[in-house]
Amino acid sequence: MYHRNILVEQTDPEIFAAIQAENARQEHHIELIASENYASPAVMAAQGSQLTNKYAEGYPGRRYYGGCEYVDVAEQLAIDRIKQIFGADAANVQPHCGASANEAVFLAFLKPGDTIMGMSLAEGGHLTHGMALNMSGKWFNVVSYGLNDKEEIDYDAMERKAHETRPKLIIAGASAYSLRIDFERFAKVAKAVGAIFMVDIAHYAGLVAAGVYPNPVPHADVVTSTTHKSLRGPRGGIILMKAEHEKAINSAIFPGLQGGPLMHVIAAKAVAFKEALSPEFKTYQQQVLTNARIVAETLTQRGLRIVSGRTESHLMLVDLRAKGITGKEAEAVLGSAHMTINKNAIPNDPEKPMVTSGVRIGTPAMTTRGFKDEEARVTANLIADVLDNPRDAANIEAVRAKVNALTSRFPVYR
């Protein structure tokens, strides 16, 4: 028997100390990593519930275990809500992460040696879209598309390559591309060459849900996403698909890739999806875009180059070469000033992947804590202040003091 009042601090002080330290870091630092966000207390409560104890292999109404009547309710709510958000025919909410969701699509439609087409990792794509070291690059023949001289997706070159190579699957989506993606153009190309069209909106899902970024669901055979990032849920994945693909996708997840689903996480997904259906969520996502635009414009005014010249989403890539600093060093010094970002390669980057010539900046997390136009402008100027004098300890200390004053006014959790 367990006593509910015996918590982590009594059972495992070492883990409790690490949790408390991370809580403090999140409160005191401005989070600018584009793939991170803050889940609501309601989402975290669902994820920390007793649903973690329940095995539920299968799907609602078709389980391999008894006692699933209540977790069935949770999963069906998650399915119904995510379908409503995106206007999808069918949905699977069981993937443990975005990579699992992508792998399930490959398992459903491809055989080893088939040709796939995705965006080059070096120009903004994701490692699960064909990187050589990823299973997608090892199991399949990969053809990549990239950017034109304006650092926009080269749709004409993509179309030519598709007709030349006749891929079985075409993937749209990116992890470091700031502009809107023309999903309709991709869909027409996929149809012309007889390819399955898959879209990975892991980064853009929250924006799509709020109607402030193009929705690929009407155009794609399958759409995958994570449930954290801009969607602001627990860490996990989803797959949306046309009705005719539901059986193949569901079989690819279970029993193809996974066993028992994480019912506590699925319940937390359902809570996040309900939050995403609210008017407040749309207002939030509109502010995410506004904040990103202000940050990009301010950094440009301070002498930094934004890849593609602008942002039309929640993120941007910043070329640091004019400041004589690498992405690796910028990540470290900005971290010292209590601003968390990640180093990121820019197109045709001469530096190694663990060094890079750029950083990626995103606004979902800062917006969740309440930052609006003025705070976005202040944050961008603080970033530039650090990058102007990255090796000046007094400068870093002064910026850190300003960051701490700002974060104290906007706590993540009150």
From Swiss-Prot:
Annotated positions of the N6-(pyridoxal phosphate)lysine modification: K229
Alphabetic keyword roster: Amino-acid biosynthesis, Cytoplasm, One-carbon metabolism, Pyridoxal phosphate, Transferase
Sites annotated Plays an important role in substrate specificity: H228
Recorded superkingdom: Bacteria
Function: Catalyzes the reversible interconversion of serine and glycine with tetrahydrofolate (THF) serving as the one-carbon carrier. This reaction serves as the major source of one-carbon groups required for the biosynthesis of purines, thymidylate, methionine, and other important biomolecules. Also exhibits THF-independent aldolase activity toward beta-hydroxyamino acids, producing glycine and aldehydes, via a retro-aldol mechanism.
Family label: Belongs to the SHMT family.
Official protein name in the record: Serine hydroxymethyltransferase
Source organism: Polaromonas sp. (strain JS666 / ATCC BAA-500)
Gene designation per UniProt: glyA
